[in-house]
Structures are given as C-alpha cells and as structure tokens.
C-alpha cells in the first residue's frame, strides 16, 4: 500500500504550457473572425509563407497548408538512399514554419517521385 502511495506521488503528468497574455489576446481576437483558408501545393517548398502568415495573424483566419507530398523526391540528381531522410527533413521544416507563421500543417499520402520531362516518364514511375 505504501509503495502504491509513493508511486502516485512521484508520478507527474506533463505540465501544460501557459499561454502569454499576448497569445491569449490573439486567441480571443481569432474567435471573432469567421473565415478559413486552405493553401494547397505539391511540394514543401511551394508554399507562400508570407500569405499564410498574413491570413493567420493579420486577417485572423483559420489558416492551413496542405502539402501533397513531403518532398522526398527531391531532384533526380539526389541519390536514392537520401530520399526518405530528405522527406523527413522537409517535413520538420514545414512543421517549424507553421509554428512561426501560425498556420496548421497537413500532408497527403501522395508520393513524390522527382521530376519528369515527358508524360510517359511519369506513368512509368
């Protein structure tokens, strides 16, 4: 019984971050706006971060970016063994960008297979 009591007092739950007064004020202002925007693009480096930041912070719209791929295709000159790591790196970059610009990040399951010069090349991949 004593062991259970000691375990219960030692276990700590994750402490929630307390928002600053500025973050609370921005959140209240955002509640007064009825609007949302979804920015869609094929690759992680195709987004317009200035537009996302403007819509999220100035217009106070619920703003999100949908990247259809994670950018693991890269350029055809990049070695195939780096593809997955490149996708992971670009994913983390997008998540960090959304923490800065105030948007929400979404991904689809589309596979990035690199550049194609001709439609036949695309369908063969």
Give residue ranges: language-model regions.
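Active-site rim/loop-helix segments in enzyme catalytic domains that contact anionic ligands
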Residues: 14-125
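Bacterial N-terminal signal peptides
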Residues: 1-12
């Amino acid at each position: 019984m004593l062991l259970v009591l000691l375990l219960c007092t030692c276990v700590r739950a994750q402490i929630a971050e307390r928002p600053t007064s500025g973050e609370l004020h921005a959140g209240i202002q955002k509640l007064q706006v009825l609007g949302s925007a979804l920015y869609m693009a094929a690759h992680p480096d195709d987004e317009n971060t200035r537009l996302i930041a403007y819509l999220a912070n100035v217009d106070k719209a619920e703003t999100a970016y949908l990247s259809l791929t994670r950018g693991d295709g890269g350029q055809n000159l990049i070695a195939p063994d780096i593809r997955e790591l490149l996708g992971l790196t670009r994913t983390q970059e997008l998540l960090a960008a959304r923490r800065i610009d105030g948007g929400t990040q979404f991904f689809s399951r589309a596979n990035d297979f690199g550049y194609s010069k001709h439609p036949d090349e695309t369908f063969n991949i």
